[in-house]
Regions:
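Short glycine-rich His-centered loop
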Residues: 50-70
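Active-site-proximal helix/loop segments of hydrolytic enzymes
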Residues: 49-51, 75-256
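Bacterial N-terminal signal peptides
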Residues: 28-40
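N-terminal secretory signal peptides that target proteins for export/translocation
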Residues: 1-23
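Hydrophobic residues within membrane-embedded alpha helices
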Residues: 2-4, 24-30, 113, 209
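Boundary at the C-terminal end of the N-terminal hydrophobic targeting segment
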Residues: 42-47
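Extended alpha-helical regions
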Residues: 1, 24, 181-185
Length: 256
């Protein structure tokens, strides 16, 4: 006779229990496998991140051009290169900086840093002036826009040009316009124009480009001797927008 305990009867089906347990184990194993694949993919993605050398053009002792306001180019270069580096770093890229600490550094030492690091790209950030004859003639307000330079003497010229195109496309998409002034057939300029729409020129003798053994390019972000252009380039929003555009172009070309 079954004793009535007052509790509901529990029926255990051993076959059903085994089936449920077996299914649970299979599900657990499958989940563990999926997690392992995700972790492996994340590790591979991290390993695939690019090494980028972001060079701040000039130094405090040799600050480059002087803007219409009297502020020197190095300060503009420092602001924009910091924005580019921050954007790349936020996306997990490995960023090395040169000339950001204010110390003197030779041009060849800048590219050597990229060579030693086996960097995926060396990019030098500058701001532009115009020839002295144009300054003396008071033509500053006629010139504006960015320019990108690559060197055919760089052994990775094709990759350099590809990166220049990617950056040029992002700058155009960000609302910037290219300056074609450096292609003018005048003394000190006359740089071969590779792509007028994207503002890409060849400047074969630029030391930081020709001594790099990795893809390399130089960007003139805008013309600071033009007072209107200088004021725009000094704005925090402009710096952030340019930094984001340049970083996006870098990531597009190094991921290819």
């Amino acid at each position: 006779m079954r004793r009535d305990t007052g509790r509901p009867a529990t029926v255990t089906n051993n076959d059903e229990s085994m089936t449920i347990t077996s299914g649970f184990l299979r599900g657990t194993i499958a989940l563990a496998g999926a997690l392992a694949l995700v972790c492996a993919s994340a590790t591979t993605a991290r390993a695939a991140l690019s090494t980028i050398v972001v060079d701040t053009g000039h130094t405090p002792a040799h600050p480059g051009a002087t803007g219409a306001s009297g502020r020197v180019e190095y300060r503009y270069n420092l602001d924009l290169s910091a924005a580019v580096a921050a954007e790349l770093g936020a996306h997990g890229e490995h960023v090395l900086r040169t000339s950001a600490d204010g110390r003197e550094i030779a041009l060849s030492a800048r590219s050597a840093r990229a060579n030693d690091a086996h960097a995926d790209l060396f990019v030098s950030i500058h701001h532009d002036s115009i020839q002295q004859a144009y300054l003396d003639a008071g033509r500053q307000r006629e010139f504006h826009g960015y320019a990108i330079f690559v060197s055919e003497r760089n052994p990775r010229y094709a990759a350099s040009l590809r990166c220049a195109r990617e950056i040029g496309e992002r700058l155009r998409a960000a609302g910037e316009t290219p300056s074609l002034y450096h292609a003018d057939p005048i003394r000190g300029e006359n740089r071969p124009l590779i792509d007028a729409r994207l503002g890409i020129h060849r400047f074969d003798d630029l030391v930081v480009l020709r001594t790099a053994r990795v893809p390399a390019l130089l960007i003139e972000a805008g013309v600071i001797v033009n007072p209107q252009e200088e004021a725009r380039l000094a704005q925090a929003d402009t710096i952030r927008r340019l930094g984001a555009a340049i970083a996006a172009g870098i990531e597009a070309c190094t991921a290819a």
